[in-house]
Amino acid sequence: MDIILGVVMFTLIVLALVLVILFAKSKLVPTGDITISVNGDADKAIVTQPGGKLLSALAGAGVFVSSACGGGGSCGQCRVKVKSGGGDILPTELDHITKGEAREGERLACQVAVKTDMDIELPEEIFGVKKWECTVISNDNKATFIKELKLQIPDGESVPFRAGGYIQIEAPAHHVKYADYDIPQEYREDWEKFNLFRYESKVNEETIRAYSMANYPEEHGIIMLNVRIATPPPNNPDVPPGIMSSYIWSLKEGDKCTISGPFGEFFAKDTDAEMVFIGGGAGMAPMRSHIFDQLKRLHSKRKMSFWYGARSKREMFYVEDFDGLAAENDNFVWHCALSDPLPEDNWDGYTGFIHNVLYENYLRDHEAPEDCEYYMCGPPMMNAAVIGMLKDLGVEDENILLDDFGG
């Protein structure tokens, strides 16, 4: 009898707790439709369900806000202005938003919970962002650790981007084995030397990342990316390899791939100032886009030079393209510096790190380096070294433009 009574009492207690939880949920968790007012325009208002994040609610309504980290709160790109209904700003947002900006309503859409009706402001250009399912045209090695992914836009569609812009690419859940990569023989030596074929990328959820475009606006119907494989650092080989780069490197001709865009802020200024482009690694992409756009589409007569850093000749690419541009345009020159040339390279060009080469062979004797515009994209250490050198020369922040893909 005592056992039965104990079971009954336990059951009643559990039921009571469930009722308390359900009651609390009904009071604390909103139900019904939530209306998100956008730019005070009734036609742009979004009706959604509570419980998710603002970034997802916007995407569900076909409004794609840039988020290079896929909504993790680390890139700080998904900035919107929340005029009401967003709650208090979170500590994760304050890494990217100043207190002054927060007072103005600046928030990260990926961190704002949708709980009540909201009133937000978005830049008008966001409404031009679209999503496309593209087809892989080619995916070829251009260097040991860099591939050129070329995508075909669906027939009748176009991506109205500006040179220096970027798209976001989606990777589904996947299991990629590096052993399945088709690495050309000329690059296999380093892959085997560093035992890279042992790695695998196992991902159970969709991932979104941003990549700058290497093509320029008049290369119609395609999107071209330079993608560096993100392998674990040598001193910490147990770190998982890069999710998105592993996926992109697995793509083959004919595969489907979803992108959204265009996005961007790394655009050329409309001035007559001299342009100095500095790149390294996969930072080649926006450099190619900008330089081709200036010379082939705009037929610019601005003085410009391109300084690219690589380890060896094996890591140089688009050489014929830039040689051709230099031959066709008297106002353009380009130089490559190798930091670790191989004996078989028979290299007689510049050697060393690109920031030193640029300074010693050009800017040191330039009559007014502070008047030039500097456009750069490369590994974080390169960016920091170049910026430090430019600061020492008296170049103001407004003339230093950075596509900080690795920051």
Swiss-Prot record:
InterPro entries tied to this protein: 2Fe-2S_ferredoxin-like_sf (IPR036010), 2Fe-2S_ferredoxin-type (IPR001041), Beta-grasp_dom_sf (IPR012675), Cbr1-like_FAD-bd_dom (IPR008333), FAD-bd_FR_type (IPR017927), Flavoprot_Pyr_Nucl_cyt_Rdtase (IPR001709), FNR_nucleotide-bd (IPR039261), NqrF (IPR010205)
Binding-site residues for [2Fe-2S] cluster, renumbered to this chain: C69, C75, C78, C110
Gene Ontology terms for molecular function: 2 iron, 2 sulfur cluster binding; electron transfer activity; metal ion binding; oxidoreductase activity, acting on NAD(P)H, quinone or similar compound as acceptor
Localization in the cell: Cell inner membrane
Requisite cofactors: [2Fe-2S] cluster; FAD
E.C. number(s) listed in UniProt: 7.2.1.1
First-level EC class: translocase
Stretches the record annotates as Catalytic: 272-389
Residue stretches making up the 2Fe-2S ferredoxin-type domain: 32-126
Catalytic activity line of the entry: a ubiquinone + n Na(+)(in) + NADH + H(+) = a ubiquinol + n Na(+)(out) + NAD(+)
UniProt-listed CDD domains: fer2 (cd00207), NADH_quinone_reductase (cd06188)
Keyword Zinc-finger appears in the UniProt entry: no
Cofactor info, note text: Binds 1 [2Fe-2S] cluster.
Bilayer topology: Single-pass membrane protein
Keyword ATP-binding on entry: no
Protein name: Na(+)-translocating NADH-quinone reductase subunit F
Species annotation: Vibrio parahaemolyticus serotype O3:K6 (strain RIMD 2210633)
